[in-house]
Amino acid sequence: PATGKELDMPGLDLHALHSDYDSLCRRGIGGIAAERLAFSIMHGNGNVIIVVDEALSGLLGDEVGSGLAREICESFQAIRVDGIAFVRIVTGVVQMTYYDRDGTNASMCGNALRCVTQYGVEQGYLAAREDIVMTDDGPKWVSADGGRIRVCLGTGREFQRVDADRYFVFTGVAHLVVLLGDHQDLEAVDVRTEGAALRYDDELCRRLSHSEGLHVDFMQRHAAGVRIRTYEVGVEDETRACGTGSAASAYVASRVWGVPGPVRVGVRDGEIQVEETERGLVIEGVTGHLFGTIAPPVPAPATAVQRVPSRA
Protein backbone atom coordinates (compact mmCIF):
# COMPACT_ATOMS: atom_id res chain seq x y z
CA PRO A 1 0.00 0.00 0.00
CA ALA A 2 1.12 3.54 -0.74
CA THR A 3 2.08 5.51 2.33
CA GLY A 4 3.69 8.62 0.90
CA LYS A 5 0.50 10.69 0.89
CA GLU A 6 -0.76 9.85 4.37
CA LEU A 7 -1.76 12.64 6.72
CA ASP A 8 -1.88 12.59 10.48
CA MET A 9 -5.24 12.13 12.15
CA PRO A 10 -5.63 11.94 15.92
CA GLY A 11 -5.94 8.34 17.06
CA LEU A 12 -5.20 6.85 13.64
CA ASP A 13 -3.23 3.60 13.87
CA LEU A 14 -1.49 3.13 10.52
CA HIS A 15 -0.14 -0.28 11.54
CA ALA A 16 -3.70 -1.44 12.19
CA LEU A 17 -4.80 -0.05 8.82
CA HIS A 18 -2.06 -2.08 7.13
CA SER A 19 -3.25 -5.16 9.03
CA ASP A 20 -6.82 -4.57 7.87
CA TYR A 21 -5.63 -4.33 4.28
CA ASP A 22 -3.49 -7.47 4.56
CA SER A 23 -6.51 -9.35 5.90
CA LEU A 24 -8.60 -8.00 3.03
CA CYS A 25 -6.03 -9.25 0.51
CA ARG A 26 -6.03 -12.73 2.03
CA ARG A 27 -9.77 -13.26 1.87
CA GLY A 28 -10.79 -11.13 -1.11
CA ILE A 29 -13.93 -9.06 -1.24
CA GLY A 30 -17.18 -9.75 -3.04
CA GLY A 31 -15.46 -12.29 -5.26
CA ILE A 32 -12.87 -9.67 -6.27
CA ALA A 33 -9.17 -9.96 -5.42
CA ALA A 34 -8.43 -7.07 -3.08
CA GLU A 35 -5.16 -6.41 -4.89
CA ARG A 36 -7.26 -5.26 -7.87
CA LEU A 37 -8.73 -2.36 -5.93
CA ALA A 38 -7.07 0.97 -6.63
CA PHE A 39 -8.27 3.10 -3.75
CA SER A 40 -7.36 5.82 -1.32
CA ILE A 41 -8.77 6.21 2.17
CA MET A 42 -9.32 9.97 2.39
CA HIS A 43 -11.06 12.34 4.74
CA GLY A 44 -12.88 15.64 4.62
CA ASN A 45 -12.51 17.24 8.05
CA GLY A 46 -12.41 13.77 9.62
CA ASN A 47 -15.32 12.35 7.59
CA VAL A 48 -13.60 9.19 6.29
CA ILE A 49 -14.30 8.34 2.64
CA ILE A 50 -12.75 5.63 0.47
CA VAL A 51 -12.28 6.74 -3.13
CA VAL A 52 -12.22 3.73 -5.47
CA ASP A 53 -10.92 4.30 -8.99
CA GLU A 54 -12.98 2.00 -11.20
CA ALA A 55 -10.69 2.30 -14.23
CA LEU A 56 -7.46 1.59 -12.36
CA SER A 57 -9.22 -1.26 -10.52
CA GLY A 58 -10.54 -2.77 -13.75
CA LEU A 59 -13.99 -2.98 -12.20
CA LEU A 60 -16.93 -3.85 -14.42
CA GLY A 61 -20.22 -2.02 -14.04
CA ASP A 62 -22.04 -4.97 -12.46
CA GLU A 63 -19.24 -5.41 -9.91
CA VAL A 64 -19.86 -1.97 -8.43
CA GLY A 65 -22.77 -1.61 -6.08
CA SER A 66 -24.22 -1.61 -2.61
CA GLY A 67 -22.82 -4.98 -1.53
CA LEU A 68 -19.25 -4.20 -2.56
CA ALA A 69 -19.39 -0.78 -0.91
CA ARG A 70 -20.70 -2.20 2.36
CA GLU A 71 -18.12 -4.99 2.40
CA ILE A 72 -15.22 -2.61 1.78
CA CYS A 73 -16.38 -0.32 4.60
CA GLU A 74 -16.75 -3.20 7.03
CA SER A 75 -13.30 -4.56 6.15
CA PHE A 76 -11.52 -1.72 7.93
CA GLN A 77 -11.64 -1.89 11.72
CA ALA A 78 -8.81 0.53 12.55
CA ILE A 79 -10.95 3.44 11.44
CA ARG A 80 -14.65 3.85 10.75
CA VAL A 81 -15.19 4.35 7.04
CA ASP A 82 -18.29 6.50 6.54
CA GLY A 83 -18.77 5.85 2.84
CA ILE A 84 -17.41 4.87 -0.57
CA ALA A 85 -17.08 7.07 -3.66
CA PHE A 86 -16.64 5.13 -6.90
CA VAL A 87 -14.98 7.24 -9.60
CA ARG A 88 -15.22 6.57 -13.33
CA ILE A 89 -14.67 8.59 -16.50
CA VAL A 90 -17.40 8.52 -19.16
CA THR A 91 -16.84 10.40 -22.45
CA GLY A 92 -14.21 12.55 -20.79
CA VAL A 93 -16.32 13.48 -17.76
CA VAL A 94 -15.59 12.35 -14.20
CA GLN A 95 -18.55 10.62 -12.55
CA MET A 96 -18.96 9.93 -8.83
CA THR A 97 -21.33 7.33 -7.39
CA TYR A 98 -21.57 7.39 -3.61
CA TYR A 99 -22.63 4.75 -1.10
CA ASP A 100 -22.99 5.16 2.66
CA ARG A 101 -21.26 2.60 4.88
CA ASP A 102 -24.47 0.56 5.13
CA GLY A 103 -24.61 0.25 1.33
CA THR A 104 -27.25 2.93 0.75
CA ASN A 105 -26.79 4.75 -2.55
CA ALA A 106 -26.89 8.45 -1.61
CA SER A 107 -27.48 11.15 -4.20
CA MET A 108 -24.79 13.36 -2.70
CA CYS A 109 -22.03 13.55 -0.10
CA GLY A 110 -20.32 16.92 0.09
CA ASN A 111 -17.15 15.67 1.75
CA ALA A 112 -16.89 12.77 -0.72
CA LEU A 113 -17.15 15.29 -3.55
CA ARG A 114 -14.30 17.27 -2.00
CA CYS A 115 -12.18 14.11 -1.71
CA VAL A 116 -12.97 13.11 -5.29
CA THR A 117 -11.99 16.60 -6.43
CA GLN A 118 -8.58 16.37 -4.77
CA TYR A 119 -8.08 12.84 -6.07
CA GLY A 120 -9.23 13.73 -9.58
CA VAL A 121 -6.86 16.69 -9.84
CA GLU A 122 -3.94 14.63 -8.53
CA GLN A 123 -4.57 11.89 -11.08
CA GLY A 124 -5.05 14.29 -13.97
CA TYR A 125 -8.75 13.55 -14.38
CA LEU A 126 -9.85 17.07 -13.44
CA ALA A 127 -8.51 20.55 -14.16
CA ALA A 128 -7.35 22.26 -10.99
CA ARG A 129 -8.77 25.70 -11.81
CA GLU A 130 -12.32 24.43 -12.25
CA ASP A 131 -14.15 21.46 -13.65
CA ILE A 132 -17.35 19.42 -13.44
CA VAL A 133 -18.07 16.16 -11.62
CA MET A 134 -21.26 14.30 -12.49
CA THR A 135 -23.17 12.96 -9.48
CA ASP A 136 -26.55 11.37 -8.81
CA ASP A 137 -27.67 14.90 -7.86
CA GLY A 138 -26.56 16.30 -11.20
CA PRO A 139 -23.38 18.03 -12.44
CA LYS A 140 -21.36 19.83 -9.77
CA TRP A 141 -18.77 22.59 -10.16
CA VAL A 142 -15.48 21.80 -8.41
CA SER A 143 -12.16 23.58 -8.00
CA ALA A 144 -8.75 22.94 -6.46
CA ASP A 145 -7.32 26.28 -7.55
CA GLY A 146 -4.39 27.31 -5.37
CA GLY A 147 -4.73 24.10 -3.38
CA ARG A 148 -8.15 25.15 -2.02
CA ILE A 149 -10.66 22.31 -2.48
CA ARG A 150 -14.01 23.99 -3.18
CA VAL A 151 -17.16 22.28 -4.46
CA CYS A 152 -20.65 23.55 -5.25
CA LEU A 153 -23.63 21.55 -4.03
CA GLY A 154 -26.20 23.64 -5.89
CA THR A 155 -28.80 25.82 -4.22
CA GLY A 156 -30.67 24.95 -1.04
CA ARG A 157 -33.99 23.38 -2.03
CA GLU A 158 -37.36 22.71 -0.37
CA PHE A 159 -36.55 25.13 2.46
CA GLN A 160 -39.27 25.27 5.09
CA ARG A 161 -39.88 25.87 8.76
CA VAL A 162 -40.99 22.68 10.51
CA ASP A 163 -41.71 24.22 13.91
CA ALA A 164 -40.27 26.80 16.31
CA ASP A 165 -36.73 25.44 16.36
CA ARG A 166 -36.52 23.07 13.39
CA TYR A 167 -36.03 23.79 9.70
CA PHE A 168 -35.75 21.58 6.64
CA VAL A 169 -33.57 22.08 3.56
CA PHE A 170 -32.37 19.75 0.80
CA THR A 171 -28.69 20.18 -0.14
CA GLY A 172 -28.23 17.02 -2.19
CA VAL A 173 -29.73 14.93 0.62
CA ALA A 174 -32.48 15.74 3.12
CA HIS A 175 -31.45 17.71 6.23
CA LEU A 176 -33.39 18.64 9.34
CA VAL A 177 -31.62 21.48 11.17
CA VAL A 178 -32.38 21.73 14.89
CA LEU A 179 -31.63 25.11 16.45
CA LEU A 180 -30.19 25.25 19.96
CA GLY A 181 -30.45 28.32 22.16
CA ASP A 182 -27.58 30.01 23.97
CA HIS A 183 -28.67 28.37 27.21
CA GLN A 184 -28.33 24.88 25.72
CA ASP A 185 -25.13 22.83 25.55
CA LEU A 186 -24.33 21.42 22.12
CA GLU A 187 -21.81 19.04 23.65
CA ALA A 188 -24.48 17.59 25.94
CA VAL A 189 -26.75 16.55 23.05
CA ASP A 190 -27.05 12.79 22.65
CA VAL A 191 -26.70 12.98 18.88
CA ARG A 192 -26.94 9.25 18.29
CA THR A 193 -30.19 8.85 20.23
CA GLU A 194 -31.91 12.14 19.44
CA GLY A 195 -30.73 12.08 15.84
CA ALA A 196 -32.01 8.54 15.28
CA ALA A 197 -35.41 9.43 16.75
CA LEU A 198 -35.84 12.23 14.20
CA ARG A 199 -34.24 10.32 11.33
CA TYR A 200 -36.77 7.49 11.80
CA ASP A 201 -39.79 9.71 12.55
CA ASP A 202 -42.14 8.31 9.89
CA GLU A 203 -44.74 11.04 10.29
CA LEU A 204 -42.12 13.78 9.93
CA CYS A 205 -40.52 12.05 6.93
CA ARG A 206 -43.90 11.74 5.21
CA ARG A 207 -44.70 15.37 5.96
CA LEU A 208 -41.43 16.43 4.34
CA SER A 209 -41.80 13.90 1.48
CA HIS A 210 -38.52 12.15 2.26
CA SER A 211 -39.26 8.54 3.15
CA GLU A 212 -35.54 7.69 2.91
CA GLY A 213 -35.01 9.41 6.26
CA LEU A 214 -33.50 12.66 7.45
CA HIS A 215 -29.96 13.67 8.24
CA VAL A 216 -30.15 15.70 11.45
CA ASP A 217 -27.94 18.69 12.27
CA PHE A 218 -27.92 20.17 15.77
CA MET A 219 -26.79 23.78 15.39
CA GLN A 220 -25.76 26.52 17.80
CA ARG A 221 -24.58 30.08 17.21
CA HIS A 222 -20.91 30.74 17.81
CA ALA A 223 -18.84 33.91 17.86
CA ALA A 224 -17.15 32.90 14.60
CA GLY A 225 -20.32 31.59 12.95
CA VAL A 226 -22.10 28.38 13.97
CA ARG A 227 -21.19 24.97 15.33
CA ILE A 228 -22.96 21.74 14.41
CA ARG A 229 -23.09 18.07 15.23
CA THR A 230 -24.63 15.76 12.64
CA TYR A 231 -26.41 12.40 12.66
CA GLU A 232 -26.04 10.84 9.21
CA VAL A 233 -28.36 8.46 7.40
CA GLY A 234 -26.43 5.42 6.17
CA VAL A 235 -23.86 5.74 8.93
CA GLU A 236 -26.61 5.73 11.57
CA ASP A 237 -24.42 7.64 13.98
CA GLU A 238 -22.72 10.98 14.45
CA THR A 239 -19.92 11.75 11.99
CA ARG A 240 -16.87 13.96 12.48
CA ALA A 241 -18.10 16.28 9.75
CA CYS A 242 -20.86 16.50 7.15
CA GLY A 243 -20.48 18.61 4.02
CA THR A 244 -24.14 18.70 3.01
CA GLY A 245 -25.03 19.25 6.67
CA SER A 246 -22.66 22.20 6.89
CA ALA A 247 -24.25 23.67 3.76
CA ALA A 248 -27.76 23.09 5.13
CA SER A 249 -26.89 24.60 8.50
CA ALA A 250 -25.28 27.66 6.92
CA TYR A 251 -28.32 28.10 4.67
CA VAL A 252 -30.64 28.06 7.68
CA ALA A 253 -28.34 30.21 9.84
CA SER A 254 -28.21 32.97 7.24
CA ARG A 255 -31.99 33.07 6.87
CA VAL A 256 -33.12 32.53 10.44
CA TRP A 257 -30.32 34.11 12.47
CA GLY A 258 -29.00 36.53 9.88
CA VAL A 259 -25.48 35.10 10.07
CA PRO A 260 -23.47 36.83 7.30
CA GLY A 261 -21.64 34.80 4.70
CA PRO A 262 -19.37 33.14 4.09
CA VAL A 263 -20.56 31.15 7.11
CA ARG A 264 -17.93 29.39 9.19
CA VAL A 265 -19.34 26.06 10.37
CA GLY A 266 -17.50 24.41 13.23
CA VAL A 267 -17.55 20.60 13.06
CA ARG A 268 -15.92 17.90 15.18
CA ASP A 269 -12.70 18.15 13.18
CA GLY A 270 -12.11 21.77 12.33
CA GLU A 271 -14.20 24.08 10.23
CA ILE A 272 -16.05 24.04 6.91
CA GLN A 273 -16.67 27.35 5.19
CA VAL A 274 -19.92 27.78 3.27
CA GLU A 275 -20.41 30.55 0.74
CA GLU A 276 -23.56 31.30 -1.24
CA THR A 277 -22.62 32.16 -4.82
CA GLU A 278 -24.42 32.49 -8.15
CA ARG A 279 -23.70 28.79 -8.69
CA GLY A 280 -25.11 27.80 -5.31
CA LEU A 281 -23.69 26.68 -1.97
CA VAL A 282 -19.91 26.29 -2.15
CA ILE A 283 -18.18 24.40 0.65
CA GLU A 284 -14.48 24.43 1.49
CA GLY A 285 -12.48 22.60 4.14
CA VAL A 286 -9.57 20.28 4.86
CA THR A 287 -9.14 17.13 2.75
CA GLY A 288 -6.34 14.60 2.69
CA HIS A 289 -5.16 11.03 2.17
CA LEU A 290 -4.80 8.58 5.05
CA PHE A 291 -3.89 5.29 3.36
CA GLY A 292 -4.26 3.55 0.04
CA THR A 293 -2.92 1.72 -2.99
CA ILE A 294 -3.02 4.54 -5.55
CA ALA A 295 0.15 5.24 -7.49
CA PRO A 296 1.75 8.71 -7.21
CA PRO A 297 -0.36 11.42 -8.86
CA VAL A 298 0.31 12.82 -12.32
CA PRO A 299 0.11 16.53 -13.24
CA ALA A 300 -3.40 17.86 -13.78
CA PRO A 301 -4.39 19.14 -17.25
CA ALA A 302 -4.40 22.89 -17.76
CA THR A 303 -8.03 22.97 -18.87
CA ALA A 304 -11.12 20.89 -18.32
CA VAL A 305 -12.05 18.19 -20.79
CA GLN A 306 -15.69 19.24 -20.97
CA ARG A 307 -17.91 21.95 -19.51
CA VAL A 308 -21.41 21.27 -18.26
CA PRO A 309 -23.47 23.86 -16.32
CA SER A 310 -23.96 22.95 -12.66
CA ARG A 311 -27.54 22.13 -11.68
CA ALA A 312 -29.07 24.35 -9.02
Regions found by a protein language model. Name each.
Residues 1-146, 169, 177-312:
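A glycine-rich beta-to-alpha transition motif near the start of alpha/beta enzyme domains, typified by
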Residues 152-166, 191-193, 197-200:
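Active-site glycine-rich loop that binds ribose-phosphate moieties when present
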